[in-house]
Amino acid sequence: MKALAKLERGPGLTLTRVKRPEVGHNDVLIKIHRTAICGTDIHIWKWDDWAQKTIPVPMHVGHEYVGEIVEMGQEVRGFAIGDRVSGEGHITCGFCRNCRAGRRHLCRNTVGVGVNREGAFAEYLAIPAFNAFKIPPEISDDLASIFDPFGNATHTALSFNLVGEDVLITGAGPIGVMAAAIAKHVGARNVVITDINDYRLELARKMGATRAVNVSRESLRDVMADLHMTEGFDVGLEMSGVPSAFTSMLEAMNHGGKVALLGIPPAQTAIDWNQVIFKGLEIKGIYGREMFETWYKMVAMLQSGLDLSPIITHRFAADDYEKGFAAMLSGESGKVILDWTV
């Protein structure tokens, strides 16, 4: 089958032919319709330090996808041939303490599709049936293909009660922008998002952010004054991994505020602990999606009117993957979709 793979230890990916995956007794085989390019895939493309330490070579990659089930293992129940599915990209062990307690998103033995094992940038993908998630007919293939990052945004944004709250989001990448849309959808009062990329800040405005702030030109304090905020933000969602952004967030938080961290800062990042301790801030690290509560909430929000369509800005045939990666690397894109059916 056709697949997009890392064949050599260096930058780039190659469209090649690989063996169609085998289907175990508890697996489903998915014929891929659409995939989306993730920031993780950009790290793999660039072959940065993280990728060099993490990605097996050779291996085909990718973990954001939608397709249909074309084959099932003999032990699979609850699915049928022809079901349209996406899937949880974190394959968990099932036997550690957290898995046995129903907290699979905290599994210490997690294996990532397209990161530690063969991925979805291919015509077919085999995964455990447990990880597959049926997509309702009213949700398009394009939207279903971005459920993985949409899930990151949902898990982060819904970590705390947002109803009537003032929310600060640092980082207007696709996940940050989707988090802004989610926050408004569920009842936040003011949703302010910061970045230095005007293209992505404009996407955030289209998705419903109250204010999209280019912090290279505009003061966050001035924006807070314009919004008549006198006490600081109630909830912070850190999506950038940029130390200066996190510092600004801590300074802007109200006493008793809550902060969720999805962005990954450098390992030795220093912060002002006085801001955390004397303000009584609650800080929570976010990884992946809650299985599968996050997935049900994603579907429910789309079915109740959440519009994520502006975040999908580019579409290409899978054979034109280089154009898709170029769009992502340009910094002037939202989500980029690759079509494996043409």
UniProtKB/Swiss-Prot annotation:
The lineage of its organism: Bacteria, Pseudomonadati, Pseudomonadota, Betaproteobacteria, Burkholderiales. One of its GO terms (molecular function) is L-threonine 3-dehydrogenase activity. Its cofactor is Zn(2+). Binds 2 Zn(2+) ions per subunit. One of its GO terms (biological process) is L-threonine catabolic process to glycine. PROSITE patterns: ADH_ZINC. Pathway: Amino-acid degradation; L-threonine degradation via oxydo-reductase pathway; glycine from L-threonine: step 1/2. Gene3D superfamilies: Medium-chain alcohol dehydrogenases, catalytic domain, NAD(P)-binding Rossmann-like Domain. Catalyzes the NAD(+)-dependent oxidation of L-threonine to 2-amino-3-ketobutyrate. This is L-threonine 3-dehydrogenase. The keyword NAD applies. Its EC number is 1.1.1.103. Belongs to the zinc-containing alcohol dehydrogenase family. Its main location: cytoplasm. Zn(2+) 2 binds at residues 93, 96, 99, 107. NAD(+) binds at residues 175, 195, 200, 262-264, 286-287. The gene is tdh. The record marks 148 as: Important for catalytic activity for the proton relay mechanism but does not participate directly in the coordination of zinc atom. InterPro entries: ADH-like_C, ADH-like_N, ADH_Zn_CS, GroES-like_sf, L-Threonine_3-DHase, NAD(P)-bd_dom_sf, PKS_ER, Zn_alcohol_dh.
